[in-house]
Amino acid sequence: MLDTVTKQDHRHSGGALRPFPDARDIEAVLTLATRAPSIDNTQPWRWRVDRTSLHLYTDPGMQLPSTDPDGRDLILSCGAALHHCVVALAAMGWRADVHRLPDPADPGHLAAIEVSPHSPDSAETVLAEAIPRRRTDRRTYSARPVAATEIAAMAAVAAQMGVTLRVVDARERLHDIVKRAALAHATDRDYLVELARWSGRYGSRAGVPARNIPEHDCGAPIPGRIFAGPGLAQPPGTSPAQDNAIILVLGSEAEDRLAQLRAGEATSALLLTATVMGLASCPITEPLEIPETRDAVRDDVWGAQGYPQMLLRVGWAADSAAALPPTPRRALCDVVEWAGP
């Protein structure tokens, strides 16, 4: 599938440039687009393909009412899928012209994508090749520091995507906020039932599999979400005290649907950039899901005008870390609608 996207040019038919990718190419693109990370791997998106454009919609049935009551995580997840789609199109030879929130009467219609022929450069190809390699790695990382040049490269990507990126210096304050969010969730029965339904899974096409969930470590510098049914061992010889990951916070000037969609796109761009550089990464959303702790992140960690939209943990995986398996995805027929002729 990756070779189809990045190594061949299917823009021509009978010697002439085609105005729109054919069905095989669209399936290849959307296969990569649906590899985007999403809240609890719910994959809360729907795609509609017509004769001249692609359309991204939310899938309200995949919203988590207890984890994500205001739908922030849903929009961020769809934004990541949108960016994955744009990257895959570019690598295949199509420039995407994205119209965000194109229908005021339908807030679930997040994007309309028109395309034109395009000659991909090596950077676009490399980014697309990172899509199937990217993993959400919740394990302990190594003591190797993330270099200033690597942080600068990620900051430049964030700026290109229209968001602000900051490295979290107030780690102790963030640690306390994360613990407060976890405590609030631990006393929310509906949340716990929902989390148990979507994590620790075996043989499902959605949700977080047990094989991708490490044992929770409350001594971690920034503790992760307490998923159900962990089945992943920590890398041998690692300890939270030696974990030298950085925490990045992405922020925007506004706090609305468009800002959240853009932040999701930027999240995708940063995660793929980290993958290209060989870095491990993991989004952190729990402290931003509760209004009180989200305000605390804004006041005590972000410390600037605007709104924090996403936290990312980035670092070097331990040399002893086993390769992570990919998380499952719903079949394309479950998330893609093909318009009639």
State the predicted function of each range.
Residues 1-341:
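Acidic, surface-exposed loops and disordered segments
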